[in-house]
Amino acid sequence: MSKLIIFAPQCGGNHLANMIGASQNLDNCLNLQEIELAYQNDKNASHTHMNEFFINEMISYTVTIKNNSIYVGHLDEVWNNWDRLKDKIKDVLVIDLSKKAQETIRKNKITYLESCSYTKEFIEKLFPNWNVESIHLDDLFGNADMLKFILDGTSFSLDNRCVKLHNIWLKKIKDSK
């Protein structure tokens, strides 16, 4: 079975998948050293998927969902691909937008619909066969050690080596404001 991260645009889902995939040596992900090198040398690398795991590519039906992999997508993309995903995905992590996001790139841009849709409760109702976990947007854009602590004990745990990668990503976010 594979994992899925559901997130709203500009909410760090690709970066989170890069870290989780590398930490857990998932089949469709690069290793941490390769990702770190890309993050340091390509200003856009930390804002995109580093390999084939964007669920939007499923629409073309050319990408097959593999076991021991991680995929990412926005809610509408996941919904549109439900028939192809339902039996291949087990664990889902949603980046939760339910509370007011404080210091993130999406500040003042989160819509009411997003704040209601990107929650653990909503995703559990929409996709009842999946094990759903959540992390709040502010926690993702915060301290790497706290992020690791929050994800420990879930199927989305992070390796200690992700701290440096997360700090590179946060610096890029802050420098782009």
What are these language model-derived features?
Residues M1-N108, E114-F122:
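PAPS-dependent sulfotransferase catalytic domain
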